[in-house]
Amino acid sequence: MYYTARHSCCTLQPKPSEFGLLLLPLGVFCMTFTNQITAVATCRTPYKQKFGIPRQPGLVEARGYVELEGHINHLDAVRGIEQYSHLWLLFCFHENLAQGWKTTVRPPRLGGNEKLGVFATRSTFRPNGIGQSVVKLHRVVQRKGKVCLEISGMDLVDGTPIIDIKPYIPFSDSIEGAVGGIAQEAPKL
């Protein structure tokens, strides 16, 4: 499966069949499907290129906003969202899609000296190009005819397509006693 990016949307397209089994190079069978994912919003941030972005959300208190797009651009779509302090943003790594992905990566936290499986990391080079970040919600405003969520703590490049927005719910999203592997503690800034 791969994404093809078209402006503010990502399309998931399996090869070679519409629905069935796909034989992967390693001999693993995988069910395939077709689903088009369209961006519901665009994230506006002070980070104009990927090299200045914090490695994880919440490390820097920079402010930005999520701007609703198209038919989603309606206050009813965010009715009640201000009762939450934080939100999950699901997004497309739109700047990395053309570069593809590898089964193993070298996480910066390990100094680039050790390889881990892509699913054991938060690498931006992922098989389906989907990421998630938790951000602090400050308020809902309207700007130039668009519904906007003012946020902080994001780790996204300006213009990132947002494919879903969900409330952060502390009792289920924060797991007591969870183990963080190589990222047990926040990096030192």
Model-inferred region functions:
Residues Y2-Y3, H7, Q13:
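Low-complexity, intrinsically disordered or signal/transmembrane-proximal segments
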Residues C9-C10, C30:
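Cysteine-centered motifs
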Residues T11, S17-E18:
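Alpha-helical and His/Cys-centered functional microenvironments
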Residues E18-C30:
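Short, Lys/Arg-enriched N-terminal segments with co-localized hydrophobic residues
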Residues G27-V134, H138-L189:
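Glycine-rich, low-complexity intrinsically disordered segments
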